C-alpha cells in the first residue's frame, strides 16, 4: 500500500519498525489508532513493536531485544527533541512541536494556496483562512490585550465582508489557540474583541495551559471555518491520513453536541469510518476540495521541514 511504499522509498530495505507513541494512553480512540497502524504495517510484512524507549541508554532496543530499522514517531515531541539514536526516524524529529509553530505552517502554505487558487480562478480565501499571531504573553497584559481586541474587531469585519460577498450566512468566529503544540484543551472561540477583553480567569488558565504543564506564550488567532457537513443529525468533518504527500485514507469526526462553527474535537466527539457514511455530496467534497487542501498542506509541511 501507500504507507509501505513510502517507507521503502524513504528508508530502503527494512524489516523491523518501532512505533513511538504519545506518553498518555487515556484516550481509547488513540490506542485503537495505534493498534490499527500496527496492523497496517504488519500486513505490509514488517515486524512491529510499540512503546516509549529510554533514550538515555543510547541506541533504542525493542521488546524483542533487537535494534529497529526505523522509528515511526507518533509523538508530537512537545516535551523536547530526541537525541541522536543512530536509527532513521520518520517523520523528521526536527518537526516536533518543541520548536514548530502553527503560524510557520500557514506561512509556508499561503503561497501554495495562492498559486492553486490562481490556477482555478477562485478567491484564495476560499481555500485558506486569515490569521494573526499574538506574541510574548500579550493576553496577560491589559494594554496589549486592548490593542489586540481592536485588531480582532477589524479582523472580524474583514471576514464579515467576505461572508457578504459570497452569500455565507452566520456570524464569523475566531479561534484562539497555542501557536505551538497539539494540545486541544486550550482552544477558545470568540466573536468580538470585547470577549477577548473580558476573558475569565478560568478561560485564561485553560488557554495558557500547554501539554505537559508548559505555559503557552504565543497564540494563533485564526478565522474559524464552518464545518459545512452533517450526517445523522451530527456535524461532521473529514480527517485525512497522508503519506508521501498523498492522502491515503480518511475518517470523520462527528459531534452531536456542537454546531458547525464550533471546535468538534471535544470529549463528546465520535469517529466514523467513511464506509458508514452513504452520502454522495460528502464523498464528492472529500475526494475533491478536502483532498486538494490536505495535499497542499503536505507540500507546506515539506517546505517547513526544509527550512
List each model region and its residues:
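C-terminal active-site "lid" helix and adjoining low-complexity regulatory extension at the edge
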Residues: 246, 253-307
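Phosphate-binding site of ATP-dependent enzymes
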Residues: 154-160, 166-173, 180, 185, ...
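Short C-terminal domain-edge/linker segments immediately following a structured domain
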Residues: 49-53, 102-105, 120-124, 204-209, ...
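Short amphipathic alpha-helical segments
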Residues: 33, 151, 195, 284-293
Amino acid at each position: 500500500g501507500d504507507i509501505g511504499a513510502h517507507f521503502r522509498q524513504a528508508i530502503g530495505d527494512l524489516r523491523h519498525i518501532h512505533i513511538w507513541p504519545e506518553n498518555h494512553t487515556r484516550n481509547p480512540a488513540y490506542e485503537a489508532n495505534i493498534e490499527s497502524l500496527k496492523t497496517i504495517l504488519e500486513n505490509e510484512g514488517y515486524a512491529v513493536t510499540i512503546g516509549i524507549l529510554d533514550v538515555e541508554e543510547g541506541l533504542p532496543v525493542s521488546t524483542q531485544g533487537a535494534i529497529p530499522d526505523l522509528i515511526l514517531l507518533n509523538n508530537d515531541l512537545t516535551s523536547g527533541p530526541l537525541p541522536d539514536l543512530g536509527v532513521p526516524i520518520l517523520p523528521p524529529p526536527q518537526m516536533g512541536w518543541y520548536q514548530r509553530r502553527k503560524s510557520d505552517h500557514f506561512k509556508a502554505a499561503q503561497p501554495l494556496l495562492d498559486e492553486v487558487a490562481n490556477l482555478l480562478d477562485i478567491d484564495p480565501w476560499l481555500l485558506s483562512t486569515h490569521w494573526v499571531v499574538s506574541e510574548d504573553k500579550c493576553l496577560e497584559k491589559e494594554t496589549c490585550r486592548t490593542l489586540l481586541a481592536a485588531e480582532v474587531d477589524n479582523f472580524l469585519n474583514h471576514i464579515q465582508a467576505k461572508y457578504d460577498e459570497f452569500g455565507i450566512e452566520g456570524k464569523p468566529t475566531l479561534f484562539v489557540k497555542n501557536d505551538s503544540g497539539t494540545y486541544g484543551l486550550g482552544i477558545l472561540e470568540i466573536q468580538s474583541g470585547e470577549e477577548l477583553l473580558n476573558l475569565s480567569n478560568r478561560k485564561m488558565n485553560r488557554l495558557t495551559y500547554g501539554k505537559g504543564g508548559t505555559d503557552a506564550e504565543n497564540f494563533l488567532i485564526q478565522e474559524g471555518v464552518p464545518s459545512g457537513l452533517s450526517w445523522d443529525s451530527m456535524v461532521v468533518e473529514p480527517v485525512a491520513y497522508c503519506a508521501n504527500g498523498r492522502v491515503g485514507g480518511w475518517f470523520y469526526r462527528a459531534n452531536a453536541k456542537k454546531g458547525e462553527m464550533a471546535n468538534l474535537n471535544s470529549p463528546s466527539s465520535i469517529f466514523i469510518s467513511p464506509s458508514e457514511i452513504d452520502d454522495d455530496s460528502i464523498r464528492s467534497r472529500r475526494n475533491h476540495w478536502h483532498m486538494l487542501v490536505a495535499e497542499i498542506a503536505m507540500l507546506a509541511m515539506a517546505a517547513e521541514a526544509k527550512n
